[in-house]
Amino acid sequence: MVKKTYLFLIIILISHSILSEGFVNKAEDYNITDYKSKRVNLVDLNGDYYLDIVLNNKWLLLNDNGKIFELKKDSNLNFNKKRKTVLSVFGDIDNDGDIDCYSGFTARYEDFDKENNKWVYNSKKDKGFRDRILLNDGTGKFRIIKTNISKRYAAPLGAVYLDFDRDGYIDLFQANDYRKYGILYGCYENILWKNINGKNFENINEKVGLETVREYGTSNSSRPSYGAGACDWNNDGKIDILSLSYGRQKNRLWKNNYPEKFTDISEKVYFDGDEIRHGKYPVWVDRGKEKEFRANGNTFSVAPMDYDNDGDIDLFVGEITHAWAGSSSDLSALLINTGKKNGYKFVRIKASDINFPRKRRKRIYKKHGIKLWNNGDLYVSWIDYNRDMLPDLIIGSSDYPDKQRLKIYKQLEDHSFKNVTDKLNINWEGVGGISVGDVDRDGDKDILVGKSFMRLNKKYRKKYLNGIDKNVAGLWINETENDNNWLGIFLRGKGENFSNKFGIGARVKIYTPDGTIQTREIYGGNGHCGQQNPPEILVGLKKNKKVEKVEIFWPNKNNSVQIIKNVKPNQYILIRENEKSVKQIF
């Protein structure tokens, strides 16, 4: 009888262990399903340290102590109902301690004059819509201010904040698309906008070496950019710029040499694309060979992370590719940083080589009997969902009807990955955007995900998606339970002549007794159409009962380093620039 009792208890414990890892979609419980939403942001917009939600660039839902979200009707994010905001990126532009907004609009106001081989402005298309800067009053209510950004039109599909010159104000890198979609080589120039004392912005491309030309196919051509990123790729304390190219063109890594000009070193470090550059299509595709500059990828997103805890920032890039495009069309890939001794060059490992094959709905090309497939990896990010100090990979796929899903790949001890999406109870097809953060402040990260119906017609949705007709967001709450500890960190800089208020560009190292050093950076966006995670740090600590040291490398002109020792786990702390004491927030 005793043996049976013990056996019964063991079965219960094992069952509990199996059920202890997983996510639950609580969008309805949290009151966010009344709004159609493709684009999503998690960001604290009223200064209470709880993450609020922005849906489709226009609805602001304030977080009530991690329990429910309520619409803020007077946010003014949807300031012109006729203007369709393409992306929103949030950061403290004026250093007043609350988070402001860059609101991007895709303006295609030009036509291509084939006879004279030039672009011509079409005033009939211009409705006066431009990009805007909106300042926050601290409660989540925004007002438009006049800046030089609004004096010109462009077609942004990516934007990221960084303080490239470490003057204490965050600058804005704007990644722009085609002047007119379908005209293959006509692209707007990407722009680095320097923040002028929180009141205006200046286009400084010429001053800092970022100017590109309209002529296509050269090393200095403007390229259609569908995303952007920023990180300190080479550990020199300066934030570098990642420009992500569409149309099978090369990506750019702009090395920050401040006070000297930026230089494009993407080819030297193998960030531009993979090694297959023949440009050939499969024999069953009636299409000629592409030139070398058109034999790379369609890169939408990038996720920087020191995933292997070796002190260097690695990258994961999300790509769109198709069976018909051939082997020279880049696949999504992990770019492993090989460090100082190798010139910080990347080793590229295709996603297909580090995880299990994708499950697809089979489609047959009728004429040739060829199985067609698409990879629509528009959004990528990292999440240590089980707090084991090994960041796990999120891939958000969309836009094609062959089972493009939200997927999580668990990082194993040998730094390989395993698809655990089904094990974690996640079921989400058609990703319109992702943002990752701790919504309920319980010490693990949750996932906010938008819904896209791109190429998913009613017939398809009826057959495979239970006939859903409203693209509402999902809020996947992390309900993984284990004994692993954690630590959350908020940074606050002093502002002008010191570090920007939210520490964008800061590097933080977390030292634990087991000898692990986790390296994290605070980012102001990374990816496609405003993809952005909150400017804060949350790390797992495994079974470590304390943090021996937190080391902050502040993004100021003095390159100051601040050290906090002997930090207790399982709390969120606030660290202010050059102040010895820390404050517990949660």
What residue ranges belong to the model's regions?
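N-terminal signal peptide c-region/cleavage motif recognized by signal peptidases
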Residues: 15-17
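Beta-propeller blade repeat segments, especially FG-GAP/WD-type strand-to-loop junctions
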Residues: 20-26, 59-73, 110-145, 183-204, ...
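Repeat-based blade/solenoid architectures
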Residues: 29-41, 77-89, 148-160, 208-228, ...
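Gly/Ser/Thr/Pro-enriched helix-cap/hinge segments flanking short amphipathic alpha-helices
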Residues: 30-32, 422-429, 433, 441-586
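Calcium-coordinating acidic loop motifs
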Residues: 44-46, 50, 64-65, 91-98, ...
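Hydrophobic beta-strand segments that make up the repeating blades of beta-propeller
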Residues: 50-56, 101-105, 172-176, 241-245, ...
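Short consensus segments that form the blades of beta-propeller domains
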Residues: 78-79, 115-126, 180-185, 217-219, ...
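Solenoidal tandem-repeat scaffolds enriched in leucines and small polar residues
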Residues: 144-254, 263-282, 291-304, 320
